[in-house]
Amino acid sequence: MRAFGKLLDAGNSIILIEHNLDVIRACDWLIELGPEGGDAGGTLVAYGPPEQVRLGSSHTAVALREYEQALGLDVPVLQAAERAATYQVQVDDAALAPHIGPDHSAEEGASLQALIKARRDKRRELAAKAPGHSAIEVVNAHENNLKGMSVNIPRGKFNVITGVSGSGKSTLAF
């Protein structure tokens, strides 16, 4: 996750096909394809920040809620990200330290979840101010089993594409 943070801090965009729920919870923007695989896939099922997607009824939404419940987190993703992790990391970017909160300074280290949240908040703030093309636009994608899908993938963000096997994730990404 720290490597992703460094790439994003350098101005890169990340588009990742992923099923790991910790990674999904940490992303800025989530795109779920489905609803199933093969001929029953290839459509846009859900998209948005993970804290918004988790409120739906898709496979990923249900999995996120069940995972958070199993972890004992009965609060939305962003609030859960503020909870302290069981280990500490050093903040390598002094500009992010004020966004982490009063209990976590760069000198004493910050929880990984707090660092992820601070970086996500900073990226969202910068993207809101950025002029020009803020998204990679995919229009009427119909390769393999994609069914005329149009989607915007935010630039400079940590984007995750997820969905069941055969739903069109790799086709969309490539």
Q: What spans do the regions from the language model cover?
A:
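Conserved phosphate-binding elements of NTP-dependent enzyme cores
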Residues: 1-174
